[in-house]
C-alpha cells in the first residue's frame, strides 16, 4: 500500500471516530496539526488520564477493565465517591497515565525530524516501534505516571493532588507540542 493510500485510510478512520465522539477532545488540536504534515499521520492517541482499573488475580494487562477514568484533573470528593462504590472482588489499581501518540511517518527522515522536535520540548519517551517499506511507526508518551494498588493507599488527598499536578503538566506538554511546526 502506498503512503498516500495509507494516510488517506487513516485520516478517514480518524474522521469517522471523531464524528462518533470517540476521539479524546483534549488532544484533537495536536492530532489535527500533525495530520496536516504530508509526511505524518496519527494512528491513535490519548491525552492522558487518571483511572481506576480492575484486574484479575494474575493482574495481567489483557484482563484489565476500567472501573472509572478521567481525562484531566479529578475532584477528590468525586474520586472517593466512585472509589468507595467499588464492591467487586477483583483488585483495583489507581493509575495516572501520560499522553500517548502513535504516529506513522512516510520515511526515516520524517520520523527522525518528528522525534527531534519532541525532544526539543523535553519529551523523553518516544521512538520508533517498527519500520516497513512505506512507513515508520512511532510511539511517544509523556513522562509522568503512577501505578499503585488502591487498597494500599490510606489517605487519597495527597495522591490526588500529585495526580492532578501530573495531569496539568501533561496538558502543558500537549500545548507545547501543538505549537510546533510539524
What is each model feature region?
Residues 84-95:
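Short, flexible, solvent-exposed loop/turn segments with mixed acidic/basic and small polar residues
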Residues 105-110:
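Helix N-cap motif at beta-to-alpha junctions
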Residues 117-182:
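Helix-rich interaction surfaces within compact, conserved domain-sized segments
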Residues 102-104, 139:
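Structured core elements
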Amino acid at each position: 500500500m502506498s503512503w498516500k493510500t495509507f494516510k488517506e485510510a487513516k485520516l478517514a478512520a480518524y474522521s469517522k471516530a471523531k464524528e462518533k465522539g470517540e476521539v479524546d477532545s483534549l488532544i484533537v488540536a495536536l492530532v489535527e496539526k500533525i495530520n496536516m504534515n504530508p509526511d505524518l499521520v496519527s494512528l491513535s492517541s490519548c491525552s492522558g488520564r487518571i483511572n481506576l482499573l480492575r484486574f484479575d488475580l494474575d493482574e495481567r494487562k489483557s484482563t484489565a477493565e476500567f472501573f472509572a477514568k478521567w481525562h484531566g484533573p479529578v475532584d477528590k470528593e468525586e474520586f472517593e465517591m466512585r472509589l468507595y462504590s467499588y464492591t467487586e472482588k477483583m483488585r483495583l489499581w489507581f493509575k495516572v497515565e501520560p499522553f500517548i501518540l502513535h504516529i506513522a511517518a512516510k520515511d526515516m527522515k520524517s520520523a527522525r525530524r518528528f522525534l527531534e522536535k519532541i525532544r526539543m520540548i523535553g519529551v523523553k519517551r518516544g521512538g520508533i516501534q517498527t519500520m516497513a517499506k512505506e512507513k515508520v511507526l512511532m510511539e511517544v508518551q509523556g513522562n509522568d505516571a503512577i501505578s499503585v494498588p488502591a487498597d494500599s493507599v490510606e489517605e487519597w488527598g495527597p495522591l490526588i493532588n500529585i495526580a492532578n499536578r501530573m495531569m496539568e503538566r501533561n496538558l502543558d506538554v500537549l500545548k507545547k507540542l501543538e505549537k510546533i511546526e510539524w
